């Protein structure tokens, strides 16, 4: 009997030992696939990613950022992580989308990481072309700047923002007297208010509808609003020259640049501030998975956020004292396209060319 019990206990002890050993092995197993690396939260995350990235040698980055906005982060990444070269394919988001779709359909995966605006990010998410990820920096980002997936992961995270608001020429209109959208109906704005009819204009209309309702927007027609088929920067120049007294379609960065040159231009955030956001994401498959995740972490780091701020872009991790409004929030890509079309239609109805 004693021998039988001892034998049973020995078998149980071996089973427990094997179970513990198996658990220990599973806990110490290092991630290797893109999905595993993207979800890894170990203390050695950066070290592990860097070692793998150096073995891979490069990262292929698709982005719609322009000029110094992509060159400076690229240089900083290569300086911080020598041995990992950044190869960039840069284009407008619409062209990026076509390229990514074509490559995905052909099962030819060249892209490691993506940085582009939210409409394209939404489209790729809807087509199930993303690998969810986490990052040690994301705890500092508000929920609105992160698209949740399962298990504490995210499909994308906003890494930079641009803000449009009301720019006024102070020789025409006094800045101190302007606080919100309602003030645009005051007599001193009549004949002086202009909108860009590029993307910035319809998004401004969307913000006004969200904050004040469509009836308020229709009241602006009595203000003899002028419409301009030019860029947001060109509209800012019209305000600076005095051709326009004010425009709610001017980016903060453009107004700051013009004001720094001595022009009497002041930028005022309104009830809602339409926010153009760029976000980072991972594709469904990446040829250089370690480098891909390393680049995503880097783009969300305080180091790159400081680079963007130096270039007059905003960080989603900071509070600038106004209420951001992401026009795409709460909509899928089809719904956003429909809403954008409606905003543009209303803008043309209240304006004069």
Positions of predicted regions on the chain:
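Short, polar/charged alpha-helical segment
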Residues: 42-54, 60, 64-85, 309-313
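A bilobed periplasmic-binding-protein/Venus flytrap-type ligand-binding module shared by bacterial periplasmic
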Residues: 165-172, 208-209, 276-291, 307
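Extracytoplasmic ligand-binding site segments that recognize negatively charged/polar headgroups
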Residues: 60-75, 86-104, 108-243
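Extracellular/periplasmic bilobal clamshell ligand-binding domains
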Residues: 304, 319-353
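Bacterial N-terminal signal peptides
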Residues: 10-21
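A ligand-binding cleft/hinge motif common to bilobed small-molecule-binding domains
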Residues: 120-123, 245-264
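Periplasmic-binding protein-like
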Residues: 143, 161-163, 189-196, 200, 219-221, 226-229, 299-321, ...
């Amino acid at each position: 009997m004693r021998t039988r019990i001892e034998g049973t206990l020995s078998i149980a002890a071996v089973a427990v030992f094997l179970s513990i050993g198996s658990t220990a092995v599973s806990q110490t197993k290092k991630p290797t696939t893109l999905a595993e690396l993207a979800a890894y939260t170990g203390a050695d995350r950066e070290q592990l990613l860097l070692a793998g990235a150096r073995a891979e040698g490069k990262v292929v980055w698709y982005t719609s950022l322009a000029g110094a906005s992509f060159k400076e982060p690229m240089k900083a990444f290569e300086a911080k992580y020598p041995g990992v070269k950044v190869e960039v394919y840069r284009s407008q988001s619409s062209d990026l989308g076509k390229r990514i779709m074509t490559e995905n359909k052909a099962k030819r995966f060249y892209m490691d990481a993506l940085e582009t605006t939210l409409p394209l990010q939404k489209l790729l998410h809807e087509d199930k072309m993303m690998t969810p990820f986490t990052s040690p920096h994301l705890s500092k980002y508000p929920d609105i700047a992160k698209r949740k997936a399962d298990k504490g992961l995210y499909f994308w995270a906003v890494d930079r923002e641009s803000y449009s608001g009301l720019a006024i020429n102070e020789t025409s209109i006094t800045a101190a007297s302007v606080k919100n959208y309602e003030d645009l109906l005051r007599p001193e704005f009549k004949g002086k208010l202009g909108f860009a009819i590029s993307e910035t204009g319809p998004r401004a209309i969307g913000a006004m509808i969200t904050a004040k309702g469509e009836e308020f927007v229709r009241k602006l027609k009595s203000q003899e609003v002028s419409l301009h088929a030019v860029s947001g920067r060109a509209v800012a120049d019209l305000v600076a020259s005095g051709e326009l007294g004010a425009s709610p379609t001017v980016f903060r960065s453009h107004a700051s640049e013009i004001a720094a040159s001595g022009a009497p231009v002041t930028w005022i955030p309104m009830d809602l501030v339409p926010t153009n956001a760029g976000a980072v994401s991972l594709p469904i498959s990446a040829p250089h998975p370690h480098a891909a995740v390393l680049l995503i972490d880097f783009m969300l780091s305080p180091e790159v956020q400081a680079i963007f701020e130096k270039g007059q872009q905003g960080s989603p991790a900071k509070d600038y004292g106004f209420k951001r409004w992401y026009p795409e929030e709460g909509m899928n890509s089809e719904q956003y396209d429909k809403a954008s079309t409606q905003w543009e239609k209303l803008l043309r109805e209240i304006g004069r060319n």
